[in-house]
Amino acid sequence: MLKLLSEIGPVIAFFAGFFYGGGIQSATLYMLITSIICITLCYIIDKKVSKLSIISSTVLFVSGIITLISGDSMYIKIKPTILYVIFGIIFLMSGIRKNPFIKYALESIVRLKEESWIILSYRTAAFFFFMAVVNEVVWRNFSDETWVKFKVFGVIPITFIFILLQLPLLLKNKLPDSKI
């Protein structure tokens, strides 16, 4: 539950900051503060922070601070694109190397045949590259308000749909001792 909260908490803070705090600058500040709180809580409670969270937070802090200093919202808007491309490369390379990163992230929940992990890595890489393109299209062609709404009401459902579309692969190729 804490992991989920640490992922969506900053997004909710960004949304609230944009609509109730006065725009992208406020939203960015709220998201940075919430991210620091969430990472700190994760570390205090779990005694660790995942590598993906460290990557996400680093990109967030760099793009967020540049946005706040420069007053240019472009930097916070390209943050998702940068993250999606980084994650896409990580999952693609781990599939190519036959050492799927996604296996380490999900193995406690589901156990699959090795070739299924590789397929899932490629699909996840494709998903992240797709999301990078979608983010670029939305922020470059629509208003700040539309982009912020997309981050909350578009990205989450698209991600959920992607996960649902992976269920047939997971269910067909799970090992007998799998939890799902």
Swiss-Prot record:
Its main location: membrane. GO terms for cellular component: plasma membrane. InterPro entries: YciB. The keyword Ribosomal protein does not apply. It is found in: Cell inner membrane. It is a multi-pass membrane protein. Disulfide bonds: none annotated. Keywords: Cell inner membrane, Cell membrane, Membrane, Transmembrane, Transmembrane helix. The chain crosses the membrane at residues 4-24, 25-45, 49-69, 76-96, 118-138, 150-170. Plays a role in cell envelope biogenesis, maintenance of cell envelope integrity and membrane homeostasis. Belongs to the YciB family. This is Inner membrane-spanning protein YciB. The lineage of its organism: Bacteria, Pseudomonadati, Pseudomonadota, Alphaproteobacteria, Rickettsiales. The gene is yciB.
